[in-house]
Amino acid sequence: MKTVRVPIALVQSVMRTLREKLQQANKYLNTDYPEPTLQYNQRGTIAGSAYYANWEIRLNPTLLIENKQNFIEEVIPHELAHLLVSRHFGRVAPHGKEWKWMMETVLQVSAKRTHHFDISNVTAKTFSYACRCQEIHQLTLRRHNKVQRGETQYRCRHCQAILQLIKE
């Protein structure tokens, strides 16, 4: 997997927003939560993820570079809110009322659960398979390789036929 280098100016913008939002939360909540670790190694179509045990946020470098300010304004507060909610409330629903409150009241950001960034550059290659009902099924590289090695078979949900690779 090719490593994507995030420009230093973008890293600085991410850090600035993270610190501003964390300071805002600490002031509102009368707490002193530490700055979380940031990693730029999130893969696939996920923009970011929060790891409570490590107090860490992982960001998708490709989506960050492609969406810059929109990414920073949406994803950084979103993932920070997950960490803050886990510390402040304990184990609760990931996008429940506590998270929504943290986003809208404490961080003063719109509580959106999903991003709407263009994912064409981070979408994995898929392979076309067919069944008896002529539906085309797209299998990921991992699933395709398992079929090719004879480790597994996949069936159509409708006709229950074993999927067959369409030779291109």
Curated annotation (Swiss-Prot):
Location in the cell: Cytoplasm
GO cellular component, one term: cytoplasm
GO biological process terms on file: response to stress
Domain SprT-like, residue spans: 20-166
Coiled coil: none
Gene Ontology MF terms: zinc ion binding
Required co-factors: Zn(2+)
PROSITE patterns: ZINC_PROTEASE
NCBIfam families: PRK04860.1
Family: Belongs to the SprT family.
Name of this chain's protein: Protein SprT
Organism: Proteus mirabilis (strain HI4320)
